Amino acid sequence: MTKKLHIKTWGCQMNEYDSSKMADLLGSTHGYELTEIAEEADVLLLNTCSIREKAQEKVFHQLGRWKALKDLNPNLIIGVGGCVASQEGAHIRERAHYVDVIFGPQTLHRLPEMINHVQGTRSPIVDISFPEIEKFDRLPEPRADGPTAFVSIMEGCNKYCTFCVVPYTRGEEVSRPCDDVLFEIAQLAAQGVREVNLLGQNVNAYRGETYDGEICSFAELLRLVAAIDGIDRVRFTTSHPIEFTDDIISVYEDTPELVSFLHLPVQSGSDRVLTMMKRRHTALEYKAIIRKLHNARPGILISSDFIIGFPGETQADFEQTMKLIADVNFDMSYSFVYSARPGTPAADMVDDVLEEEKKQRLYLLQDRITKQAMRFSRLMLGTVQRILVEGTSRKSVMELSGRTENNRVVNFEGTPDMIGKFVDVEIVDVYTNSLRGIVVRTEDQMDLRVHESPSSVIARTRKENEIGVGFYQP
């Protein structure tokens, strides 16, 4: 009988990427088949996130549900990973003694050994260490799941913003070797992936070693990824303004594969609040980056993150945030009311903004950005947009659906052979959450760049350095 694995994932795109790697890894080592039904699984894994409020309580609530399954099947293995696991460690078992495996974001590659340990000894195991980049050399070859894919290029963050747990849960910044990243993307391109999203907690701080011992900057990596034949759309998430240098901005001038959409978190428009957050930049410096981006790529749309009601935030501070939103004209945002994260410097500050005031400010901010986004959508009416066709429409199986560079969903009439390819469509209707288009050009009528074939990248010889980190030499 096939053994089943169920993974529940909360949080960021990095967690989604990690969960996909867990599934691939345990599929290759133990033959586990992924299931959406927890009740039929032999192994249950919870990949957690500590960003949102009451993250720990959410974890224990879910584990309580799984305890009932463990009572019915004592051989069931329950594991907790991700950032809450990294924060709480063995303390998780103090409240949930039935948890068998506790692992951090940097030790998911050791899951096969951990599961073997539990099965062989009937005793729990905890591993929340930070073995730097080792995990990427222990993971199986990537498997494409549609025309888009996430690829992690670095982990951790050195910025230590006062509100953020990332440096404590994922460690400091470590970049994957450049050729390791290119090899993974080439493998995905050979399987039909057309769009890659490069991931990192501070992705534009990437500085990966090359096969000859040099350092590849993030700007250089973007150009190398875009040069792989078949990869015709490149995104990246998430960036920090103080690392958004002119050499990265210049890529927008000469690399058409890099999308005209950027997520660049600012958190607040108040310099006073930015200082308390230890963001190391001002609102004016942020706007200077945006101006340079618009000069390099006219029409680029910007999204951001905002924390509302940070300790000490006044009405005047909030009004400065609203002014920044109007000045930059953000297209979308991930915005939340502030809640303290245990172990961060901000958790020791007096949380003096009333909860109702936080919620009111959040409503005003989100309403402003929603209206701005709708204006951008209406401006697309009558224009021709290039979309990557991802599959059938959620609205009708008789139609197809894809996304524009600026992440708008477009539904249109098409043929199944268009799935996984690019088409140009004229936007004929604008709705709140989607657009409607008519096909005007198919991929065989486009002049997409061809530079380096995936096979030429894959053909590189794999080597390991003195600490066992893999790289690929031409």
From Swiss-Prot:
User: Looking at the keywords, is Cell division present?
Assistant: no
Classification via SUPFAM superfamilies: Radical SAM enzymes
Q: Where is the TRAM domain?
A: 378-441
Identify the EC number(s).
2.8.4.3
Q: What class of enzyme is it?
A: transferase
For this protein, the record's PROSITE patterns field holds: MTTASE_N, MTTASE_RADICAL, RADICAL_SAM, TRAM
Q: Name one GO cellular component term.
A: cytosol
Q: Name one GO molecular function term.
A: metal ion binding
Q: What NCBIfam families is this protein classified in?
A: miaB-methiolase (TIGR01574), MiaB/RimO family radical SAM methylthiotransferase (TIGR00089)
Q: How does it assemble?
A: Monomer.
Protein name in the entry: tRNA-2-methylthio-N(6)-dimethylallyladenosine synthase
**Per the UniProt entry, what species is this protein from, by scientific name?**
Pectobacterium atrosepticum (strain SCRI 1043 / ATCC BAA-672) (Erwinia carotovora subsp. atroseptica)
